[in-house]
Amino acid sequence: MVLSQLNGLTSPLDERHVHALQIALKGMTPTQLAWVSGYLAGIGGGPLRMPTEPKAVERITILFGSQTGNAKAVAEQLGARASEQGMDARVISMGDFNPRKLSKEQWVLIVVSTHGEGEPPENAYALHAFIQDQGAGRLEQLPFAVLGLGDSSYEHFCRTAVDFDRRLAELGAQRILPLQCCALDYRSDTERWSSDALNRLSALAPRKASNVVAMPTLRSHQDLRSHQEQSRNRARPYDKDNPYTATLLENRRITTLDAVSDVRHLALAIEPDAMHYRPGDALGVWVENDPSLADTILAGVGIDGAARIELGDEELDLRHALIERLELTQLHPTTVRGWSRASGRTGAEDAGERLEREEQTRIYLAGNDAFRLPDAGDTPLIMIGAGTGVAPYRAFLQQRAANGHPGRNWLIFGNRHFHRDFLYQLDWQAHRKAGRLDRVSLAFSRDGAEKPYVQQRLREEGKEILRWLDAGAHLYVCGATAMGQAVDHALVEIFTIEAGLDPDCASLRRYPARECYATDDL
């Protein structure tokens, strides 16, 4: 901006001051102007300020419900774009949001995933339950829009997003955009919805009023080019669309050869600064199809693998698409396999078996803020896992041992056979011997006629479970969706029978403060 432009703007300077500045600054070099700019800011005690309007700036609240981190990432990107456009936007986990304050919000955008059989993510459970309640208040003054993430192959595709969109409208809230449900390959849909939402809000909501007078930025063309080059070269964080290429150090089968499941323990070399993970996080792994299968398909249909095709917004050769981008059994885009840290996934044993030492694979970090160790190191832990769901607890105990945390630990683990499927058995024995594993309850369902499962062990240990919870224990559940539901039912029985609670209030999911209960589905 030049001084002649001040006359056309809202300015604290009258015509006399503008004229005086024009005379004083006439003929100054860029270096002299830069010095004067700093001098004026200094004697003013800080940035030169414009008068602001007394009315409060309207705020946009972006709420996310996320199980594996995808919805959180989309919400954060949306918030960053809103802020760049001058909007007063804040991004909040639904788990950190007080549902009773929903009616006081001015603009709400919801980004939420669905997991299990149409269930809300852990951090969305309380808000989801609150608005579904018959006593939820009216929300006539609340403009909103909902974006859902899910897997279209499931029966209850984006069920949680549908629930939020429907119920908010029933409560009188004003829908400013139609519900958008995004499948696994969601990037283009989320970007389009985000643009539509911000365009809509820009027409409805005022920008944050600036209280700083714009001053000219004095930079040479050379400096500007250098700055632009640095911006382009700035490292982009690794995510689903920009995966990190890791080197495989170890591929070890941790079930016996006669076990039903070929479960693999994979060790990957990751540069220390590439990603910062915590116990409870998962790795998203882009697993490639066997090149020989791709070649067989191409030979069978008589198509040259070098033929160029369009896949979404990208153009690539057909063979490359068959190996890296398409699910060969259905020819829809491949999806990321979510592997718990230090674990194999039973559903991906073929892919894990193909990986050889020193081979490379594409990964990204799928953070899970709902599945974390408690901050207090003396908090007792009850860790319930079935099959490969036991893997996060290996990381939990390693972290507690490294930190010297004294909290008691109880592992409840189930699988098919003791001798074939006791995953990480030597690790648990070492922790037990070192005094870091206070209790171990096991359930192997194929070793005898009894067929016990982890939920049966819970019922048998009901009184002790209550004692640990009364002492402040955090309870974790990791395994298949059906197993998690069975555990929840067992806990309801325990609280009903042992504690005398009403069944409608007995589940840990119904507690107002649910930090003591965390689940992670495989």
From Swiss-Prot:
Residues 241-399 form the FAD-binding FR-type domain. Residues 60-198 form the Flavodoxin-like domain. GO terms for cellular component: cytosol. It catalyses: hydrogen sulfide + 3 NADP(+) + 3 H2O = sulfite + 3 NADPH + 4 H(+). Its cofactor is FAD; FMN. Residues 217-242 are annotated as: Disordered. The gene is cysJ. InterPro entries: CysJ-like_FAD-binding, FAD-bd_FR_type, Flavdoxin-like, Flavodoxin/NO_synth, Flavoprot_Pyr_Nucl_cyt_Rdtase, Flavoprotein-like_sf, FNR_nucleotide-bd, NADPH_Cyt_P450_Rdtase_alpha. Catalyzes the 6-electron reduction of sulfite to sulfide. This is one of several activities required for the biosynthesis of L-cysteine from sulfate. The flavo-protein component catalyzes the electron flow from NADPH -> FAD -> FMN to the hemoprotein component. Binds 1 FAD per subunit. Binds 1 FMN per subunit. It is an enzyme of class 1 (oxidoreductase). Residues 220-242 have a biased composition (Basic and acidic residues). This is Sulfite reductase [NADPH] flavoprotein alpha-component. Keywords: Amino-acid biosynthesis, Cysteine biosynthesis, Electron transport, FAD, Flavoprotein, FMN, NADP, Oxidoreductase, Transport.
